[in-house]
Amino acid sequence: MGNSGFYLHNTSNCVFADNIKVGQMTEPLTDQQIILGTSTTPVAAKITASEGISLTITNNAQANSSVNIGLDAEKAYQLILDKLGDQIFDGITGSIVESAVQDIIDKITSDPSLGLLKAFYNFQITGKIQCNGLFTSSNVTTLLGGTEIGRFTVTPRSSGSMFLVSADIIASRMEGGVVLALVKEGDTQPCAISYGYSSGVPNLCSLKTCVTNSGSTPTTYSLRIGGLESGVVWVNALSNGNDILGITNTSNVSFLEVIPQKNT
């Protein structure tokens, strides 16, 4: 065993040896290793520290060895804060998201006026248009009233859906009423009629309506405008046909497809 033997320490007999092998250990202990008992034979083990734990091992030939295990306060503090922060943040965001989702679901299922967006189309009408056609009591339910100012083809994405139609038209005439009519191709009369007014200056005349889609094939609509019983109407122009403020003006027609809600 090399440098080994017995010696008397105070009143006790001691055995000493270097490079000793214990049990079935196959290698001598190395720096900072200890002998660790197991359920079978002893093994060589090394103590290590994990997050938040400090480990100090003192061992030399001239002094008693020591192993000091303590708490690394700064690392432990930061570790705890990080863990608590993650849990608090996850809890708050999870609660907010779940609450928001539930509010939306409740709104959709309880509000019969709310629909789901499917498709959106927007058409611009630019340039000046003179509308000489009139709307009268005899032609308002036919396809002869007013003057056509635009045709719009839209394709539904779902059968049984509806289009919310919004037409905002800049119209001028010598003081009097303005009539707007939306016509669906194939119909024998307008599917929606609206009224506006101009006192000789440009005014925004609007038509708001909804139309039901019976299928998912492209459908064409036309918008007709004319004076109420009398008068010439100008679109995107002054009542005398001149440009408004010397610039080109634009009117808009939009179609928004929705699916009506059915509460049961």
Swiss-Prot record:
Pfam families, per database record: Chlam_vir, Pgp3_helical, Pgp3_N
Superkingdom of origin organism: Bacteria
Keyword Ligase: no
UniProt KW keywords: Plasmid
Keyword presence, Chloroplast: no
Protein name in the entry: Virulence plasmid protein pGP3-D
Organism in which the protein naturally occurs: Chlamydia muridarum (strain MoPn / Nigg)
